[in-house]
């Protein structure tokens, strides 16, 4: 049983009351779905719906016009489909494509946590969409909410035996930490209520109030830090001996979100607390999660993430508490080395099969007049006998291609003009953006719809400086919640208002260092005006192999930030 140390008092955040009285995430969601008078559901149910993998949203492009017409907002729902390690079969890809066409806005969003995301689903179609997702043997449970989210890892298990083992471990962690309530099956899959929750505890790990906030786990396999291991609540770094996986270094308390104007909130990098044998990894993840369950801040959600718990109680205290719960001591961390946190594009061979990583700008799979990416991928899925793997950088691996199928798939790629991104600049290949407008209710500025055009203008500056092939990470979010992990980028833009961004510089190319604010509340003209002299200086003064983020720190353009507690200082 989950023995939470939650003391219900008037000081607790309202969300804690909602969870406690939700009957294990049921609330009145069923009744809300049946109400045809409105396209919305009750406010409290929107908070519970997140645990089921969905957010209620509205079209912000037409919000003002609908208000003038005295109409309710154009409500719709986003659904996020979890896929541990980004794994999906060709059949599942076809199912996702069908769902996008039938119920959503005709596009698929590949997220920065290796999940599928659909936008524009109307309330009347929400249940059937959930059913169709589950019929494909994927699901949405715990894709959002105050629980462990989609577990990340290198997307290609066929790269080596170690990568295959890592994928299996990611799936095992995901299964073990999934909520056990039957509410999901009752609401979406017409399952019967299988137990009386008034007498029995159906959540042996989480308890009635689940976690104080969302919780994220990722596994990195050096030298690739593609999952941004230091951004995770639990970051696991694979340790190999003689090309065999033996265990993991464990980092705790990473996280990207903050709030503008509130210096008590900040991004943070995970802190290494030791090494564990691979056989213990699922249990260790559970024990760390329960520390956050019991000691996380349930009074103020803005300070409820595990990073704040670690900073408040101290790394040593956290390590000792984990040791006590395990009944054994974490070992000393072991050596490892990261070289990059991006994807490797094009064809590669591994485990006797071929794999093609293609560039998907900001993770949006759609057809345009000039670029039929969605149709091309559907065509590939209809002949492909392997997998589709979602990367942590919003790209896609057509994986496990049999040798006799390679030419056929290569012809489809060529016929549709699909690109692996090799002809793009290093900046564009290393870019990420969140959804932002028009569907995200938190967005303060554009992101996905704007970053590509801004990059085009920055590319002119790179060309002038002779840096067009330089690998530089650039990320943009429409708000400071950090969905595209902007605080780790060498160049980052975080929305402050319409057309205005805070600009940050100096993140580590391998994702190990936070960036620092350089300019506040600036528009495009000032962004370009600010970047030009820095890029020219970088081209002239950099040392051999020196990355842009390292240079701006060394040159004193921004201060180095290794601890989020100094992010605002």
From Swiss-Prot:
MF term (GO), any: sulfite reductase (NADPH) activity
Keywords assigned: 4Fe-4S, Amino-acid biosynthesis, Cysteine biosynthesis, Heme, Iron, Iron-sulfur, Metal-binding, NADP, Oxidoreductase
Cofactor info, note text: Binds 1 siroheme per subunit.
Record flagged with keyword Iron: yes
Catalytic activity annotation: hydrogen sulfide + 3 NADP(+) + 3 H2O = sulfite + 3 NADPH + 4 H(+)
Amino acids binding siroheme: 483
Binding-site list for [4Fe-4S] cluster: 434, 440, 479, 483
Presence of keyword Heme: yes
Cofactor: siroheme; [4Fe-4S] cluster
Annotated pathway: Sulfur metabolism; hydrogen sulfide biosynthesis; hydrogen sulfide from sulfite (NADPH route): step 1/1
Enzyme nomenclature, EC number: 1.8.1.2
GO cellular component terms, A-Z: sulfite reductase complex (NADPH)
Taxonomy, superkingdom: Bacteria
Function summary: Component of the sulfite reductase complex that catalyzes the 6-electron reduction of sulfite to sulfide. This is one of several activities required for the biosynthesis of L-cysteine from sulfate.
The family this protein is said to belong to: Belongs to the nitrite and sulfite reductase 4Fe-4S domain family.
The protein's assembly and partners: Alpha(8)-beta(8). The alpha component is a flavoprotein, the beta component is a hemoprotein.
PANTHER family named among the record's database cross-references: SULFITE REDUCTASE [NADPH] SUBUNIT BETA (PTHR11493:SF47), SULFITE REDUCTASE [NADPH] SUBUNIT BETA-RELATED (PTHR11493)
Name this protein carries in UniProt: Sulfite reductase [NADPH] hemoprotein beta-component
